[in-house]
């Protein structure tokens, strides 16, 4: 709510405090202010430059936003620029806005793409956007007595997720994986499913990823009709590190308004949280801080905690966050993914080995976890089914070395049955996505959690032992399985 704000940016500044640039080193700018008028940490400063080359249409000046990061003494602050500093000179006049960067909030954000400062990037020439309220991006997390204590499952309709790594309503979910295993596709699919099946509001933060992917995402969401229910904030890999560091806060501020003022459940997507950490490392180096382990910033845990603590459920309303996490060189001991682990309620690990088998989503069923995979939250039937599936897959994994040496025919009957069921389970954990329809030609499917549990219980019980492995590939629920098996019998004359 409004009382949760740290420092509200004033609507009008009659006499903004002016300072001057004393030092420029890349995107780090030192600014001197009059004695007694030093801006607070995280205040936004602006400097306007005339005749600096290319401007936005209709603009005669280039405005640069600076964010105060350090007080150096002698009435001087050290700032980080959020835009390129080409053309900036010593002695240029800098104005203190009197508060942190503030961004538009509310219904005006839906269907629009914003930069870190809240400027609309996809506004049509004839479109008039009236911003009635702005919130600062630096805010305190909800007080402890405002937090929601109830825990419940968030149904996605994706079999492998609902069964083995159920998501928490108002929780934080990490999508782990190396390059090219499907993190962004899974996020796009979740945006589609939230809009279609839950009618919720989504906020997307594109942090340090490819601009092409951002354009593709906007186009696909527009085609699917979900763009009007989504606010998007982008700070892609060609942006300044200061911008990439603050984009998640801009998106989170918009999500907090929907939760706290409009009393809505919100899904916040961050792609990619590793780039947030990476940007923090770059800013830390620019500011001259001593690096910590593997060259990361010494305040890595503090920066991550400040972001993650704001992503939570208040009484009756929630922000559920899905965060894609790039794992450098597939090394899970790297400080960036390791620091993120501590804040997550569920982890979905995407495996290159499973992707190489052509099974998508390439979720590793044995490595992915969820804190609510517990009878108290999901029920005994769900818990027992998930454990049976994991036990079969684990036993199959243990038998692979033996099979490679002597072949599957030399196994005992019980192990043969386990391997055959495991292969069917692996195929059945795959699923067609709505966002991939135009690439695969196969329609996407939504499988309710109850149907998922029933189907996998039947497989574990041996009901489908006579059904070939191929029948389990590329389908949705039980009805799809039985229809495909019936069609295969007709085709092969069985």
UniProtKB/Swiss-Prot annotation:
It is an enzyme of class 7 (translocase). CDD domains: ATP-synt_F1_beta_C (cd18110), ATP-synt_F1_beta_N (cd18115), F1-ATPase_beta_CD (cd01133). It catalyses: ATP + H2O + 4 H(+)(in) = ADP + phosphate + 5 H(+)(out). The keyword Membrane applies. The keyword Transport applies. Belongs to the ATPase alpha/beta chains family. F-type ATPases have 2 components, CF(1) - the catalytic core - and CF(0) - the membrane proton channel. CF(1) has five subunits: alpha(3), beta(3), gamma(1), delta(1), epsilon(1). CF(0) has three main subunits: a(1), b(2) and c(9-12). The alpha and beta chains form an alternating ring which encloses part of the gamma chain. CF(1) is attached to CF(0) by a central stalk formed by the gamma and epsilon chains, while a peripheral stalk is formed by the delta and b chains. This is ATP synthase subunit beta. It comes from Bifidobacterium adolescentis (strain ATCC 15703 / DSM 20083 / NCTC 11814 / E194a). The gene is atpD.
């Amino acid at each position: 709510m409004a009382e949760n704000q740290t420092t509200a940016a004033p609507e009008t500044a009659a006499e903004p405090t002016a300072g001057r640039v004393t030092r420029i080193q890349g995107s780090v700018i030192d600014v001197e202010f009059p004695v007694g008028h030093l801006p607070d940490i995280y205040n936004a400063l602006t400097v306007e430059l005339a005749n600096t080359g290319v401007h936005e249409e209709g603009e005669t000046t280039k405005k640069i936003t600076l964010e105060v990061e350090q007080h150096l003494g002698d009435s001087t602050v050290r700032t980080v620029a959020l835009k390129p500093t080409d053309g900036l000179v010593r002695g240029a006049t800098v104005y203190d806005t009197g508060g942190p960067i503030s961004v538009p909030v509310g219904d005006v954000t839906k269907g629009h793409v914003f930069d870190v400062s809240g400027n609309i990037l996809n506004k049509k020439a004839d479109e008039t956007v009236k911003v009635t309220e702005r919130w600062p991006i630096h805010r305190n997390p909800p007080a402890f007595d405002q937090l929601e204590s109830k825990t419940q499952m968030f149904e996605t309709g994706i079999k492998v997720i609902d069964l083995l790594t159920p998501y928490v309503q108002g929780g934080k979910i990490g999508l782990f994986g190396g390059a090219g295993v499907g993190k962004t596709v899974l996020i796009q699919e979740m945006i589609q499913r939230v809009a279609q099946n839950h009618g919720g509001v989504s906020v997307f933060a594109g942090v340090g990823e490819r601009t092409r992917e951002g354009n593709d995402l906007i186009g696909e969401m527009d085609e699917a009709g979900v763009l009007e229910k989504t606010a998007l904030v982008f700070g892609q890999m060609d942006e300044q590190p200061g911008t990439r560091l603050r984009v998640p806060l801009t998106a989170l501020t918009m999500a907090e308004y929907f939760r706290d003022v409009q009393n809505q459940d919100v899904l916040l997507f961050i792609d990619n949280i590793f780039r947030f950490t990476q940007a923090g490392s770059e800013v830390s180096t620019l500011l001259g801080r001593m690096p910590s382990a593997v060259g990361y910033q010494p305040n890595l845990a503090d920066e991550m905690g400040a972001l993650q603590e704001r992503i939570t459920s208040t009484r009756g309303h929630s922000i559920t966050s899905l965060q894609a996490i790039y794992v450098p060189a597939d090394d899970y001991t790297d400080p960036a993914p390791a620091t993120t682990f501590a804040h997550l309620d569920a982890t979905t690990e995407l495996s290159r080995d499973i992707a190489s088998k052509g099974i998508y989503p390439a979720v590793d069923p044995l490595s992915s976890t969820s804190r609510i995979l517990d009878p108290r939250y999901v029920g005994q039937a769900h818990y027992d089914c998930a454990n049976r599936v994991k036990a079969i897959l684990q036993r199959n994994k243990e038998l692979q070395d033996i099979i490679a040496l002597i072949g599957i025919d030399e196994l005992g009957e019980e192990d043969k049955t386990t391997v055959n069921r495991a292969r069917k389970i692996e195929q059945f954990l795959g699923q067609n996505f709505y966002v991939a329809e135009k690439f695969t030609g196969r329609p996407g499917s939504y499988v309710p959690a109850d149907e998922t549990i029933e189907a996998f219980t039947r497989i574990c019980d041996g009901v489908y032992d006579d059904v070939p492995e191929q029948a389990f590939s590329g389908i949705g629920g039980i009805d799809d399985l039985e229809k495909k098996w019936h069609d295969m019998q007709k085709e092969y004359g069985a």
